[in-house]
């Protein structure tokens, strides 16, 4: 391993003009891999729509929308709910749901902090390989 990075380095291989050989051996933690078979449908749809491979941040956004949708179902809010009440009920509902997302299994603690496990990847031959 040449260097180690956090999830913020996910997507480094897709940076325009980046010499991917410079990332060879990079170890990083990320909850998403575009090369994971379980994400194949999302990756294809994303590539068809945007012409590039999605990174963790695209997957986080996708999971975030689905998490809010699940929390809305859990809270059972009517369309005309007061925004302050909606916020309180959604905050409570988030602590009761589990979402199977592109970035893994997501749960929220009583402070509203998401809980999910990252996976270690190494860049080898220009690809993310699970470490």
Regions found by a protein language model. Name each.
Residues 1-131:
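Extracytosolic ligand-binding ectodomains
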């Amino acid at each position: 391993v040449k260097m180690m990075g956090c999830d913020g380095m996910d997507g480094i291989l897709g940076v325009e003009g980046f010499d991917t050989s410079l990332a060879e051996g990079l170890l990083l933690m990320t909850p998403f891999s575009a090369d994971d078979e379980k994400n194949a449908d999302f990756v294809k749809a994303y590539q068809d729509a945007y012409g590039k491979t999605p990174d963790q941040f695209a997957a986080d956004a996708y999971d975030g929308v689905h998490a809010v949708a699940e929390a809305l179902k859990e809270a059972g809010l009517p369309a005309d709910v007061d925004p302050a009440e909606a916020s309180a009920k959604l905050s409570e509902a988030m602590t009761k749901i589990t979402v199977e997302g592109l970035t893994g299994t997501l749960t929220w603690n009583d402070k509203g902090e998401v809980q999910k496990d990252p996976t270690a990847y190494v860049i080898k031959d220009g690809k993310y390989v699970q470490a």
